[in-house]
């Protein structure tokens, strides 16, 4: 198994939900965690529950390419390198296409797709230069399933899944790993209005565990895709 102690990880969307749970899980493994997200206050609140020696906060909006580039540059400046990049930033807006909510469409495309691309544009050259690194992205089971109110959201998650499927082939034999995580319904602020038919939602920690599993595999093992569903 790969030892995570002492490694450096950037987590976007770290202020709540799966991002926050992943930050805590990595910090417990001895990882130096860079918390990135739009809410400085929420990031500070999260950091209070963690070992301050292992935490660095960089407020970042992934829809802003300049801020994403600055995030990675700042981490390189502070730590000298990055080992792990976990993209948890995401937006879900439930609506039918025929509701014509263009602002909602823009928000999902800008965050879920362009935010990932900006992140890859910033981090992959660093990983290529050092010949190692692991990029994890939160997709969703909605990448392969669609309801009458999730067409655009499902499309964005399908897009990022395909991006990662292609990226895995591009990065073969480079030492850089890629992992897509496809969660089912998770109990986060983003899903608080969904009753899920009375079924118990997954906890954010369940997804963090899946991410840790992928990150701790031996050097020759690349876990490309993990689907996690509630029973």
UniProtKB/Swiss-Prot annotation:
Transmembrane segments: none annotated. Keywords: Oxidoreductase. Its EC number is 1.-.-.-. Gene3D superfamilies: NAD(P)-binding Rossmann-like Domain (3.40.50.720). It comes from the Bacteria. NADP(+) binds at residues 10-34. The active site is at residue 153. One of its GO terms (molecular function) is oxidoreductase activity. Substrate binds at residue 140. Pfam families: adh_short (PF00106). Belongs to the short-chain dehydrogenases/reductases (SDR) family. This is Uncharacterized oxidoreductase SH0585. It comes from Staphylococcus haemolyticus (strain JCSC1435).
